[in-house]
Amino acid sequence: MKGAIMGKFVVKEVNSGFKFDLKATNGQVIASSEVYSAKPSCLKGIESVKKNAPIANLENQLVEGYEVMKNPKFEVYADKSGEFRFRLKAKNGEIIATSEGYKAVDSCMNGVESVRKNSENAVIE
């Protein structure tokens, strides 16, 4: 697709298995996975992000009395240190990607949109 925004999934071997990072076109890591025990499981996690991120609902847990959305969904929340984060849950409720901490809510929301845009057509390295 000409003109499509394309990020990339980078698979890394770590001490206890494999994980992936989703990087935006500028090379910045915008979401990361848990550690999977085997590479095929990690690749399945990537496929799940590619399938779920573009259609996921947005559940803003920062709003008092927020509406609980159906999976798949992005959950935006504040962590214990007061930073804003998001996690992407698959249809089965499993967390398949998480963000770094952001100082501003707007930056966190931009991160969600970046995952939506960059994941669907992303290449895997």
Kindly give the residue locations of the regions a language model identified.
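A structural feature that tracks compact, well-ordered secondary-structure segments
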Residues: 8-14, 19-36, 45-49, 73-103, ...
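Intrinsic disorder/low-complexity detector
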Residues: 2-15, 51-80, 122-124
